[in-house]
């Protein structure tokens, strides 16, 4: 970052120093000024004041290039007025259509701007100011600030500017107070809107969580119901299969009992037949014995 020294009075420093007027220093800072003007050459010093700034280059050609490239440029919604510090502009526009510095960016600029003008006004003499033409009745167009030049005494100018500065400062103080109140109200409204949005988001999140829990519970209940129904079906199936097996076993047992009864009957018949045959043989033997006797 460049130094803050921009008040050297040697001819080389004067010719390589750039004055930047009508600068919105409420927004534009020293780093911003250095970033804008460093593209024209090495910056030896940079100082930012209320409403204006100085940029000190190492070489005069760099300063002239910066004046040619940046004069009349729009910086932070204001058209800047740029010239060499050693060559102030004689006439800075139409006095009938210009806006005061207090209306554009605050009354404190008048004091600092005129101090700079008085600082260099004592070293150089300029022709008297040209009388302004009649004011235009059409739309007022803002133009560059007109610099008052002449061979008047510094005491008279400083006294006049201090009075105008006091009047402008009271007006700007009221304007700033109103602006601060308006900004405060807007910020309060924005905060209320943000709070309401956050509350709505929290409600939506709670509803989503509640719905998710309900869906999860419903799914678990469905799973339990399906599992219990499956178990019931399996149990019924097993009971039906078990009953069929029991009936089959009972049928087998009945068949076995019938078979055993039939076998016993057959054995008894066979025994009866054998017994009858033995009795027949005994009868025949007795008959034969009687015949022999």
Curated annotation (Swiss-Prot):
Record carries keyword Transcription regulation: no
Residue ranges constituting the RRM domain according to the UniProt record: 16-87
Compositional bias (Basic and acidic residues): 208-222, 229-240, 269-293
Region spans: Disordered: 140-177, 208-293
Composition bias, Acidic residues: 242-263
Subcellular locations according to the entry: Nucleus
Predominant location: nucleus
Keywords: Coiled coil, Nucleus, RNA-binding
Matches recorded under SUPFAM superfamilies: RNA-binding domain, RBD
One example GO MF annotation: RNA binding
Residues in coiled coil: 177-208
Highest taxon listed in the record's lineage: Eukaryota
One CC-aspect GO term: nucleus
UniProt similarity note: Belongs to the RRM HNRPC family. RALY subfamily.
UniProt-recorded name of the protein: Heterogeneous nuclear ribonucleoprotein C-like 3
Biological classification of the source: Eukaryota, Metazoa, Chordata, Craniata, Vertebrata
